[in-house]
């Protein structure tokens, strides 16, 4: 009897096609970054209200960076849709 009796791939039948998975991930990442950007901006306002304008400015920059990353994700989505 062979000791290598369990070598088949369990995921072979359940795997999502690559393009579909990538589209879903990009959509998720875009939403995720939007949520983070909103949260960073809320905390920037709180930081300003508490005399921490220097930190607030950095939080605003982080929010902007998150949305800039989304531009790349949106471009990737566009290219995937064009195939």
Ranges and model annotations:
Residues 1-17:
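Histidine-centered metal-binding segments
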Residues 7, 78-83:
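Short, charged, intrinsically disordered terminal tails
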Residues 19-55:
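Short, contiguous, helix-prone interaction/anchoring segments in small proteins
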Residues 29, 62-65, 69:
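Amphipathic alpha-helix face/heptad-repeat signature
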Residues 56-61:
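Short, charged, amphipathic alpha-helical segments
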Residues 66-80:
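Amphipathic alpha-helical coiled-coil segments
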Residues 31-35, 62, 81:
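Aromatic-residue detector
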């Amino acid at each position: 009897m062979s000791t290598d009796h369990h070598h088949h791939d369990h995921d072979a039948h359940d795997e999502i096609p690559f393009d579909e998975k990538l589209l879903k991930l990009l959509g998720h990442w875009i939403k995720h970054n939007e949520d983070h950007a909103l949260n960073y901006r809320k905390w920037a306002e709180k930081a300003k209200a508490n005399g921490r304008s220097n930190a607030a400015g950095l939080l605003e920059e982080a929010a902007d960076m998150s949305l800039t990353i989304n531009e790349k994700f949106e471009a990737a989505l566009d290219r995937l849709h064009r195939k």
